[in-house]
Amino acid sequence: MQSGQEVVYLHLDDIIPNRFQPREVFDERALKELAASIKEHGVIQPIIVRQVNNKYEIIAGERRYKASALAGMTKIPAIINNLDDKPLK
C-alpha cells in the first residue's frame, strides 16, 4: 500500500462489482475457503474501489468482496482510488 492511502470500512451494500471484471467464473470451493478464513482472521488486504455516483465500484478484490458476503460480514476494508474507465478495460 502506498503511503497516504487511507483504509476505510465500507458497507457491502454500497459496493458494486466492476463491469470490466475479466473473471466470469469464481470457484465456489475456493470462495467458501476464503470465507472461512475471513470469518477467522478478517479481510487482511483491503479491496480497492472507486466512487461511482453514490456507490463504490470494485477495482481489485472482487473475490474478497464475494467471500466477505458469504461469511456474513457487513463491512469490508477498502482503499478509495480515483480512476477513470481507461485503466480498468
For each predicted feature, which ranges?
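Short, charged/polar connector segments at secondary-structure boundaries
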Residues: M1-N81, L88-K89
